[in-house]
Amino acid sequence: MAHQAHAYHMVDPSPWPLTGAVAALLLTSGLAVWFHFKSLTLLAMGLLLMILTMIQWWRDIIREGTFQGHHTPPVQKGLRYGMILFITSEVFFFLGFFWAFYHSSLAPTPELGGIWPPTGITPLDPFEVPLLNTAVLLASGVTVTWTHHSLMEGKRTEATQALTLTILLGLYFTALQAMEYYEAPFTIADGVYGTTFFVATGFHGLHVIIGSTFLAGCLLRQILYHFTSSHHFGFEAAAWYWHFVDVVWLFLYVSIYWWGS
């Protein structure tokens, strides 16, 4: 690329939006094929192409921001607005699940026995694994903030340790959630209660896995000296996302586990 003599965000020609779109097509059609014909081939192809696209697209962005110096203050401002809009869209995504839950629980139909939880459903105890999960995610929110402050103060070792701890807490949360799903006394097929419970908590769990991956990428970059005390928006975006995941869990815990039980 020719030397950039201005501060603004000019995107180079890239094949990754096209390969990402093809991967999305393969994933969605592959999911339908898996459900109806029990074949995983198309789904596996879509997943592989999506992973390769993500790795190479992120590699290009890291090169532009870290080695080529293209992430100037106006570009960083645009990236910040982009991340804020993305998180706003995620808020509305989860709003749909809360709407479905409250629509079903505040006025239970005769088919549900006129009560909530519906007749025949044994809800999970909110003061057992769900409470531990809440403590784990809140602790991870503290450690990710510790990472940010350490980065801003130039304390590299502390930042690396705190970020590692955050990722471990995220993985612990995922393991606890998997155990809870395995031992749950109801399934996704158990009416509207099972559906809203597993879809809402399942999508949140997926977001925890995505956030943990995002933070793991930041840990690798931190080890490779990509971040400075004043230039670390990649980590900031991951931290914002992680705090969003924390807040969604608090609403899920209070609504579905505690009030809904």
Curated annotation (Swiss-Prot):
Q: Which Gene3D superfamilies match?
A: 1.10.287.70, Cytochrome c oxidase, subunit III, four-helix bundle (1.20.120.80)
Give the EC number(s) listed in the UniProt record. Answer: 7.1.1.9
| Record keywords, A-Z | Membrane, Mitochondrion, Mitochondrion inner membrane, Translocase, Transmembrane, Transmembrane helix
Q: Which residues form the signal peptide?
A: none
Q: Report membrane topology.
A: Multi-pass membrane protein
Mitochondrial matrix-side positions? 1-15, 67-72, 153-155, 224-232
| Domain of life where this protein originates | Eukaryota
Pfam family example for this protein? COX3
> What are this entry's molecular-function GO terms?
cytochrome-c oxidase activity
Assigned GO CC terms: mitochondrial inner membrane; respiratory chain complex IV
The cellular location(s) given in this protein's UniProt record come to:
Mitochondrion inner membrane
Kindly list the residue ranges recorded as spanning the membrane.
Answer: 16-34, 41-66, 73-105, 129-152, 156-183, 191-223, 233-256
Catalysed reactions listed for this entry? 4 Fe(II)-[cytochrome c] + O2 + 8 H(+)(in) = 4 Fe(III)-[cytochrome c] + 2 H2O + 4 H(+)(out)
Gene Ontology biological-process annotations? mitochondrial electron transport, cytochrome c to oxygen
PROSITE patterns, A to Z:
COX3 (PS50253)
Which class of enzymes does this protein belong to? translocase
For the Mitochondrial intermembrane compartment, the record's topological domain ranges are 35-40, 106-128, 184-190, 257-261
Say which family it is in.
Belongs to the cytochrome c oxidase subunit 3 family.
What does this protein's UniProt record list under function? Answer: Component of the cytochrome c oxidase, the last enzyme in the mitochondrial electron transport chain which drives oxidative phosphorylation. The respiratory chain contains 3 multisubunit complexes succinate dehydrogenase (complex II, CII), ubiquinol-cytochrome c oxidoreductase (cytochrome b-c1 complex, complex III, CIII) and cytochrome c oxidase (complex IV, CIV), that cooperate to transfer electrons derived from NADH and succinate to molecular oxygen, creating an electrochemical gradient over the inner membrane that drives transmembrane transport and the ATP synthase.
Q: Describe its partners and assembly state.
A: Component of the cytochrome c oxidase (complex IV, CIV), a multisubunit enzyme composed of 14 subunits. The complex is composed of a catalytic core of 3 subunits MT-CO1, MT-CO2 and MT-CO3, encoded in the mitochondrial DNA, and 11 supernumerary subunits COX4I, COX5A, COX5B, COX6A, COX6B, COX6C, COX7A, COX7B, COX7C, COX8 and NDUFA4, which are encoded in the nuclear genome.
Q: What is this protein called?
A: Cytochrome c oxidase subunit 3
